[in-house]
C-alpha cells in the first residue's frame, strides 16, 4: 500500500491542510500592528512565529535529501520526541539558534511574504504528499 492510500495518513494531511489554510487566512488579515505584537514566546513577535513555522513548508518544498544508510532498530516517534525534548536534547541545545533564525527571517521578509508561504506553498506540498509513493 502506498503511504498516500493509508486512511490515517490522509486524515493527517487533511488536518495539516486545514491548519495551513488558517495560518494563511489569519496572516492575510493581520494589521501591521498585529504582526509586530508580542507573542507568548519571549522576544518573538507574530512575524517571528510565522517565520519559524513557515520553515517547515520551505523544507518540504525542497527536493528530499538522499536517504541515509541506517543500521540498528528503528525508533518510534515517542522515542525520538523523548530524546528531542530531554534535558540537553536538541530542543534545548538548538533553541537559541532557532530563535535567532526566526528573528532574522522575520526582519528579512515582509509579513505578506511570510503568510504567502502558507498560501502558495501549502497547497502544492499537500497535493504532492497526497500522491506520494512510499519512497517519494
Q: What kind of region is each of these model predictions?
A:
Residues 1-14, 25-28, 33:
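Actinobacteria-biased recognition of intrinsically disordered, low-complexity terminal regions
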Residues 1-11, 58-123:
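Short, helix-capping/interhelical loops that line the mouth of catalytic, cofactor-
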Residues 15-19:
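Phosphate/oxyanion-binding active-site loops and adjacent basic polyanion-contact surfaces
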Residues 20, 118, 122-129:
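Hydrophobic alpha-helical core bundles mediating ligand binding, dimerization, or RNAP-core interactions
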Residues 22-45, 63-71, 128-136:
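Helix-loop segments that flank and shape redox-cofactor active sites
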Residues 52:
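Histidine-centered divalent metal-coordination motifs
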Amino acid at each position: 500500500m502506498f503511504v498516500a492510500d493509508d486512511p490515517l495518513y490522509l486524515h493527517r494531511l487533511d488536518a495539516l491542510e486545514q491548519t495551513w489554510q488558517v495560518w494563511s487566512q489569519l496572516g492575510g488579515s493581520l494589521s501591521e500592528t498585529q504582526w509586530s505584537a508580542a507573542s507568548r514566546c519571549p522576544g518573538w513577535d507574530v512575524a517571528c512565529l510565522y517565520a519559524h513555522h513557515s520553515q517547515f513548508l520551505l523544507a518540504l518544498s525542497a527536493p528530499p535529501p538522499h536517504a541515509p544508510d541506517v543500521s540498528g532498530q528503528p525508533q518510534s516517534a515517542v522515542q525520538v520526541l523523548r530524546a528531542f525534548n530531554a534535558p540537553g536534547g536538541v530542543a534545548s541545545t538548538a533553541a537559541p539558534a532557532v530563535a535567532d533564525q526566526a528573528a532574522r527571517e522575520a526582519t528579512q521578509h515582509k509579513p505578506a511574504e511570510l503568510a504567502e508561504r502558507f498560501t502558495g506553498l501549502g497547497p502544492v506540498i499537500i497535493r504532492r504528499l497526497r500522491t506520494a509513493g512510499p519512497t517519494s
